[in-house]
Amino acid sequence: MPTTVSEEIAGYQLTLETGELAKQANGAVKVQYGNTVVLVTATASKEPKDDLNFFPLTVDYEERLYAVGKIPGGFIKREGKPTEKATLTARLTDRPIRPLFPDGFRNPVHIVSTVLSVDQNCPPEIASIIGASAALSISDIPFDGPIASVKVGKVNDEIVVTPDVDEHEESQLDLVVAGTKDAIMMVEAEANELPEDEMLEAIMKAHEEIKKIITMQEQLVEQVGQKKMEVELDLPSDELVSEVEELALEDIEKVLQIKDKLEREDAMDEAKQKVVDHLLEKYNSEENEDEEEELKEKHIKSAFDSILKREMRSRIIHENSRPDGRGQKEIRPVTCDVDLLPNTHGSGLFTRGQTQVLNVCTLGALGDVQILDGLDIEESKRYMHHYNFPPYSVGEAGFMKGPGRREIGHGALAERALKPMIPTEKDFPYTIRLVSEVLESNGSTSMGSVCASSLSLMDAGVPIEKAVSGIAMGLIKEGDQLAILSDIQGIEDFLGDMDFKVAGTEDGITALQMDIKISGTTREILKQALKQGKDGYLHILNIMKQTISEPREELSPLAPRVIKKQIDPDKIRNVIGPGGKMINKIIDETGVKIDIEPDGLIYISSSDAEQAEQAIKAIDELIKEPEVGEVYLGKVVRTEKYGAFVEILPGKEGLVHISELAEDRVGKTEDVAKVGDEILVKIINIDERGRINLSRKQALGEEDGKTNNDDKKSTKKT
């Protein structure tokens, strides 16, 4: 018998149901929001993975195209690898729940969100987050939830929770917030230059709705919640931590005074290994088993890291001393460069401390858009950003492979940051691809990608509205004391309480991503972080403007030129031709790319201006309307007893009656006009059905012999 709880949230009915589907999972909840239905399951292994030093959580978001009544495109008619949207939603589900598992929990946990039905007004990614929390909360898996999530927009200066499709199109904000009853855990936002106070207001409004959904989950737990399993947490003992502290504290204090990342990491590894060797030798002398020694080594390293974290945080809070010697608001040295690569359309290099990103911009025809075969209404996108993070960027030897979840996520964040500034298709009819190559990494390569992308776009001559920059912020909180750090580096990100990335222009925020690992993050803390973040990215923006302050007036000479031509929508079929015959002929003969919009707007893309002009002339011929009295050099395509059919324009034929072939009487059509001959003809009549009547004898009587298709060359004098 299923158990359900239901409540109206932002105008749509939200129902959580368990007990009917997927009953062998540790926890399973069917979430229905409006007509969106997502089944979320949570399973956990009974035994821990002893060889791991991290929590093995896997989140999979499974899109099913039947959810929107579609059959997958392509040769194989089933879903393949996850789409980019599915990967991003899996990350969105993972991020707010991961901090709520116990430290030292090493049992593999698997969350699977399967999308069964999609109502475009009620986003399935929100149902996935709610379902993951609910499934974990009612299961026997240790979890310090529940959490919930909502999507928020801003339409006509009003904050709207769960905006519908039409409102989403008009919204100045696309915000996803997740949190517990007491605190915000995650924020993901794209905005059209939203002020910080309005962003904060939207986050707080979202939290009010989140509390209602958490109450629903608590009701479900009261009815069907299981007793949590007893697990042994894989943590070093207090005695071991004390022993490691005694051996390592002095070295850790020295390590934290080293400003260079690589030098500091080498010293840290050396100090850690010294403690490991000392303690393993001690335990070896006590004749411990090998397996216990390996386990102990992991615990020794964990104890060392906990002391390192404590000492670094203490130095920041009490001494205002960061690992590289900067103040809390101080940003590392920034340098910028553009036009680095000779054969690309645009390039930008952004370096901030030991983080360096090269971005390359490529422009293409509208036909180069990325086709999307997913659950959203959007079927293609003309602006995309790809992010690559090779092992050498952190000084490691590794394997080069396809983009992982992290790379897809970082690329999407940088893409969102610049999206509000990208010109519309009408104003700039190009496909835009940006690729960020991370060359060095020591904190916030995603925000480095935003800055490098902005430089690259302006170098390519893309008329972006304004330049965009970004910065990563951090938070260290100990009791009532806190430090908000600008431009965090890798070690501060790893050991801090908040990862907070913000991008924007001089006039407001364009993207925001926040992950908070602790409770008690107040409105005032978020307000201070947003203000300090804006100060930081504006500082970087001013440095970028010293290199290039606005888009170049001309596109790169290597970029294709796009010419727009408006025609009557009723003439589109003339340009395309039967089975695409006419348009493909133009493309084959001129080498251009042609894209046609339903409203009759044609885009001709070519790197060769002469070829583009040839294509335009060919299109003009296809859409030209013949008029009575005009003379053409036509081609005989068919002969009958009563006359000859002559093509005067591509796809347009007329009849020369046998009596109109010559002044003298003609006994047989072929005596004057054979198939393939080119002859002069004049339009003498177009009847009410559009049929064209031609005359050869009247055309021959024209004095100047000028035709309306002079560019055609005759193969036979007539």
Curated annotation (Swiss-Prot):
One GO CC term, this protein: cytosol
- Where is it located? Cytoplasm
Q: Which branch of life, at top level?
A: Bacteria
A Pfam family reported for this protein in Swiss-Prot or TrEMBL: PNPase
Gene Ontology terms: biological process:
mRNA catabolic process; RNA processing
S1 motif domain residues: 629-697
- Which cofactors are reported in the record for this sequence? Mg(2+)
Catalyzed reaction equations: RNA(n+1) + phosphate = RNA(n) + a ribonucleoside 5'-diphosphate
Alphabetical list of Gene3D superfamilies matching this protein: GHMP Kinase, N-terminal domain, K Homology domain, type 1, Nucleic acid-binding proteins
Residue numbers binding Mg(2+): D493, D499
For this UniProt record, the keywords arranged alphabetically read as follows: Cytoplasm, Magnesium, Metal-binding, Nucleotidyltransferase, RNA-binding, Transferase
EC class, as a word, reads: transferase
Region of interest called Disordered, as start-end residue ranges on this chain? 695-718
Query: Composition bias, kind Basic and acidic residues: at what positions?
Result: 699-718
> InterPro entries per the record?
ExoRNase_PH_dom1, ExoRNase_PH_dom2, ExoRNase_PH_dom2_sf, KH_dom, KH_dom_type_1, KH_dom_type_1_sf, NA-bd_OB-fold, PNPase
The GO terms this record gives for MF are: 3'-5'-RNA exonuclease activity; magnesium ion binding; polyribonucleotide nucleotidyltransferase activity; RNA binding
**Hey, which family's this protein in?**
Belongs to the polyribonucleotide nucleotidyltransferase family.
PANTHER family named in the record? POLYRIBONUCLEOTIDE NUCLEOTIDYLTRANSFERASE, POLYRIBONUCLEOTIDE NUCLEOTIDYLTRANSFERASE 1, MITOCHONDRIAL
What this chain does, per the entry, is described as: Involved in mRNA degradation. Catalyzes the phosphorolysis of single-stranded polyribonucleotides processively in the 3'- to 5'-direction.
Name this protein carries in UniProt: Polyribonucleotide nucleotidyltransferase
Native species of this protein? Natranaerobius thermophilus (strain ATCC BAA-1301 / DSM 18059 / JW/NM-WN-LF)
Q: Which gene encodes it?
A: pnp
